[in-house]
């Protein structure tokens, strides 16, 4: 879920009963960390599928720009929001071959312009920003999913929830 900060802004947290429940279900600390990371985020492009430090470097990004992307990923809810002139600077975008007309257009996607597919962007987004759900988490056994069901579907792709008659 998202926690609103008193000074403005939001950050992602997981219900504090989740780590305890995972422990009680017999998951190791390492397994629990992987499950929680799936839901919340890795907050870095390091190791992300498709859009990662190596692929970004191959596309022409320099180390400092990749560091800026990682720093912006710490608070991002979608990776598309960090790939812009404000994070990277116009010099970077021009060096990569893009024009002010392109990167000043709010409809324009740098990730798509770099050749990434919607599926690749979605996979990287899930890794970097988290899925906001436990469904599909690595190592989480299917039979344990009901333990984590709640009143609403979680995340953009969540399907499970407790029906109103179950409350």
Where are these regions (language model features)?
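Long, C-terminal-biased catalytic regions of enzyme "large/alpha" subunits
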Residues: 1-167
